[in-house]
From Swiss-Prot:
It comes from Rattus norvegicus. The modification N6-acetyllysine is found at K215. This is Threonine--tRNA ligase 1, cytoplasmic. The gene is Tars1. Keywords: Acetylation, Aminoacyl-tRNA synthetase, ATP-binding, Cytoplasm, Ligase, Nucleotide-binding, Phosphoprotein, Protein biosynthesis, Ubl conjugation. It is an enzyme of class 6 (ligase). The lineage of its organism: Eukaryota, Metazoa, Chordata, Craniata, Vertebrata. Homodimer.
């Protein structure tokens, strides 16, 4: 787009039409920007003429390229390697920091050229796409843009509208305008501007002024421009809007400013974009598959669980859902027994003094349900670790007791904003397979190996593969650097001995200790973080936890390992529901066996068979509907995902047998009731993933 004052296009579209003329703030903002840009270009030209000097740019393969500071850009270096590389590069990474391709290099540096496949490049690509959509939203609605970040799959932009709202009927109009913006190849320009100047530029938008006043603690910050849109933004961005090859707007909702229910209501529009239309087709197919697997739909259809407005964010587990919940906990309990964990029960409500000691009151009290009792402040616990510290501390401890592994399925509550609640994945009431290991420094390596083996055992039963990342000391860490180094070395040794591939995530640990991040991959390729293995050097200090060491030192400080495998049981049930698409493996299935009598004369025998399976602790039902044909009963049981369907007729009644088939219509034929019970008990005990095939 030329540097002239923006003028509005006209044209008829579905839904809302672009405004004509555009809101006055767009032109006022552009006028200010042009003056600032001219000053910036003049300063940069002077710097390039005066301060430019030869620099060395080191590529990932170690090769060095000659360049000039304040003149050479990453894009020029990419072109020097190959035009194809330059065209396919989304963003640069200079000295490990993402960097605009057209921003001049300033000193000797390392340079990486990131393509769309890289996660950081995807975030930049989707962030730039959000700006394209933001430009279209300003031109169609004329409201005040708020936040417009990239998210895990795509991007969104929030807008404040004085009146009216956004309708899905507007998507076509917005997409058409986005395509026009893309076709214009509007350049993304970066400008560093004084805070007070930006307060003047954005005086029409109270939300941008709030960001400047409350979040920007430096004298200057950056804005980015594409076409008529100028927005507060750290960047970086793609070179121009033409780099976005295909863009789809697919969802809208309302939300609150910064998620706070007492703040303004905003309109949120979601989009997705890709550098290849084929990727969009794949994404659409994936969305359809994910929609069919949505745990909220399956939970409703299979009568597993539901939510009610009278207790937002707290799930009601129906009998069949409760079976899944309890079976998961029993699975973990059985592993606890093998692995030396001791299960404990701790209070749900604690005096706020506990949370002040732990540090949660200072940093987390907004997310806690708190109330007054006899002029004292209490809160429902959002996590178990402080309670476990009290358990460790309730009597003197000896080195002989270490490692002490305390496990807790206690009910936890977190005061999530109502707008953030999403099925079982974001709740207020939940339970975790939570455990804390109190150990000596030299025991860390063995304990971490045990935790890793534990998670491999559990995830292999579910059929999940997983990714491991070691997150090490951040810049702002607490404690002795030697202790950190020793602990990180032990974590590294544990991971190497574990034998699975892992990656280093330097500087991404918590301030109180390094951690191992674990992501599981589900049946449709999505990654979820559930397990936690986190070292904590600070909580033992806060609670003044000590033990008597073997040399008699009674002030030895333990280390705490926070660990969970399922994480939130509720969230794991959501993931498993979607992973299996409601087709539960036999051991976890809430519908394991359906007994189907051929006709009314076999009903009594069918009832006896059902009772035998019930007594053997199977989830068993019987279909005695006289209005259904045999084939219809079998089909209904298969559609309801009963793992095994036991047909009983006169022949089976006479011989004390059942005729077995599976939900996938594999026929196993006739077996005695006793044999069938015994075999199914074996498969259940083995937690077989393919019990129907293995029968």
């Amino acid at each position: 787009m030329s540097e002239e004052k923006a003028s509005s296009p006209s044209g008829k579209m579905d839904g809302e039409k672009p405004l004509n003329p555009w809101p006055e703030y767009i032109n006022t903002r552009l006028d200010m920007y042009h003056k600032l840009k001219a000053e910036h270009d003049s300063i940069l030209a002077e710097k390039a003429a005066k301060d430019s000097k030869p620099i060395k740019v080191t590529l990932p393969d170690g090769k060095q390229v000659d360049a000039e500071s304040w003149k050479t850009t990453p894009y020029q270096i990419a072109c020097g390697i190959s035009q194809g590389l330059a065209d396919n590069t989304v963003v640069a990474k200079v000295n490990k920091v993402v960097w605009d391709l057209d921003r001049p290099l300033e000193t000797d540096c390392t340079l990486e050229l990131l393509k769309f496949e890289d996660e950081e490049a995807q975030a930049v690509y989707w962030h730039s796409s959000a700006h394209i959509m933001g430009e279209a939203m300003e031109r169609v609605y004329g409201g005040c843009l708020c936040y417009g970040p990239p998210i895990e799959n795509g991007f969104y932009y929030d807008m404040y509208l004085e009146e009216g709202g956004v309708s899905s009927n507007d998507f076509s109009s917005l997409e058409t305008l986005c395509k026009k913006i893309i076709k214009e190849k509007q350049t993304f320009e970066r400008l560093e501007v004084k805070k007070e100047t930006l307060l003047e530029m954005f005086k029409y938008n109270k939300f941008k002024c709030r960001i400047l006043n409350e979040k920007v603690n430096t004298p200057t910050t950056t804005v980015y421009r594409c076409g008529p849109l100028i927005d507060l933004c750290r960047g970086p961005h793609v070179r121009h809007t033409g780099k976005i090859k295909t863009l789809k707007i697919h969802k809208n909702s309302s939300t609150y400013w910064e998620g706070k229910a007492d703040m303004e209501t905003l309109q949120r529009i979601y989009g997705i974009s890709f550098p290849d239309p084929k990727l969009l087709k794949e994404w659409e197919k994936f969305q359809e598959e994910a929609k069919n697997r949505d745990h909220r739909k399956i939970g409703r259809d299979q009568e597993l669980y539901f939510f009610h407005e009278l207790s937002p964010g707290s799930c009601f587990f129906l009998p069949k859902g409760a079976y899944i919940y309890n079976t998961l906990m029993e699975f973990i309990r059985s592993e606890y027994r093998k692995r030396g964990f001791q299960e404990v029960v701790t209070p749900n409500i604690f005096n706020s003094r506990l949370w002040m000691t732990s540090g949660h009151w200072q940093h987390y009290s907004e997310n806690m349900f708190s109330f007054e009792v006899e002029k004292e402040q209490f809160a429902l616990k959002p996590m178990n670790c402080p309670g476990h510290c009290l358990m460790f501390d309730h009597r003197p401890r000896s080195w002989r007791e270490l490692p002490l592994r305390l496990a807790d399925f206690g009910v936890l509550h977190r005061n999530e904003l109502s707008g953030a609640l999403t099925g079982l994945t974001r709740v207020r009431r939940f339970q975790q397979d939570d455990a804390h290991i109190f150990c000596a420094m030299e025991q860390i390596e063995d304990e971490i190996k045990g935790c890793l083996d534990f998670l491999r055992t559990v995830y292999s039963v579910f059929g999940f593969s997983f990714k491991l990342n070691l997150s090490t000391r951040p810049e702002k860490f607490l404690g002795d650097i030697e202790i950190w180094n020793q602990a990180e070395k032990q974590l590294e040794n544990s991971l190497n001995e574990f034998g699975e591939k892992w990656e280093l995530n330097p500087g991404d640990g918590a301030f109180y200790g390094p951690k191992i991040d674990i992501q599981i991959k589900d049946a449709i390729g999505r990654y979820h973080q559930c397990a936690t293995i986190q070292l904590d050097f600070q909580l033992p200090i806060r609670f003044n936890l000590t033990y008597v060491s073997h040399d008699g030192d009674d002030k030895k400080r333990p280390v705490i390992v926070h660990r969970a495998i399922l994480g939130s049981v509720e969230r794991m049930i959501a993931i498993l529901t979607e992973n299996y698409g409601g087709k539960w493996p036999f051991w976890l299935s809430p519908r394991q066996v359906m007994v189907v009598p051929v006709g009314p004369t076999c009903d009594e025998y069918a009832q006896k068979v059902r009772q035998e399976f019930h007594d053997a602790k199977f989830m068993v039902d019987i279909d005695l509907d006289p209005g259904c044909t045999l084939n219809k009963k079998i089909r209904n049981a298969q559609l309801a995902q009963y793992n095994f369907i036991l047909v009983v007729g006169e022949k089976e009644k006479a011989s004390g047998t059942v005729n077995i088939r599976t939900r996938d219509n594999k026929v196993h034929g006739e077996r005695t009731v006793g044999e069938t019970v015994e075999r199914l008990q074996q498969l259940k005990q083995l937690r077989s993933k393919q019990a129907e095939e293995e029968f």
